[in-house]
């Protein structure tokens, strides 16, 4: 039924909750898995810097996003190398990608380009203001994906939990 799964990860333990589900589906159907960690595109970083987004260096006339983008790419590759071994140890065929771009759009595009037949990802379970402020990559992927999407809900932890 499924021969190729795409699993988007953002580096969080919450996103990694999808791995056990992807592994189970891959083992059941003999499917291969592509792990994808979308990193920031240079033009996105420049736009965020110009807007004064929190945590982004202040925009200046000579802002060069290359070091930030390269560092994020290196971190993403290192992260995925560690994750890949967990799946390979169970006999699942795994590849990785670290494309640059807007997460939801890039996930949908790569799914289409790779011919993946199922996306397995988590949703952080935000609602109301949290969803409005942070948006929802999972929601956008669900609405635009060219294939079924298996969403694993991860509850947001509150202080004291």
PLM features: what roles do these ranges have?
Residues 1-63, 90-95, 114, 154-157:
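Small/aliphatic-rich secondary-structure junction motif
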Residues 6-7, 25, 33-35, 79, ...:
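Short, structured motif recognition centered on aromatic/hydrophobic residues
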Residues 18, 45-49, 108-109, 131-133, ...:
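Short, well-ordered secondary-structure micro-motifs
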Residues 57-78:
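A short acidic, glycine-rich active-site loop
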Residues 79-95:
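A structural motif corresponding to the C-terminal end of an alpha-helix
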Residues 98-106:
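Charged docking surfaces used in two-component/phosphorelay signaling
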Residues 112, 118-140, 158-161:
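Glycine-rich, Arg-bearing micro-motifs that act as flexible, cationic patches
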């Amino acid at each position: 039924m499924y021969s190729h799964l795409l699993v988007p990860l953002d580096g969080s333990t919450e996103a990694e909750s999808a791995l056990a589900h992807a592994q189970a589906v891959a083992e059941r159907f003999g499917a291969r898995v592509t792990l994808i960690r979308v990193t920031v595109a240079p033009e996105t970083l420049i736009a965020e810097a110009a807007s004064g987004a929190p945590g982004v260096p202040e925009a200046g006339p000579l802002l060069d996003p290359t070091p930030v983008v390269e560092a994020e790419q290196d971190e993403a590759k290192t992260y995925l190398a560690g994750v890949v071994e967990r799946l390979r140890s169970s006999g699942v065929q795994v590849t990785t990608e670290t494309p640059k771009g807007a997460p939801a759009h890039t996930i949908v595009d790569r799914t289409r380009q790779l011919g993946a037949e199922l996306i397995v990802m988590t949703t952080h379970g935000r609602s109301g203001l949290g969803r409005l402020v942070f948006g929802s990559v999972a929601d956008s992927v669900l609405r635009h994906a060219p294939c079924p999407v298996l969403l694993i809900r991860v509850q947001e932890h509150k202080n004291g939990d």
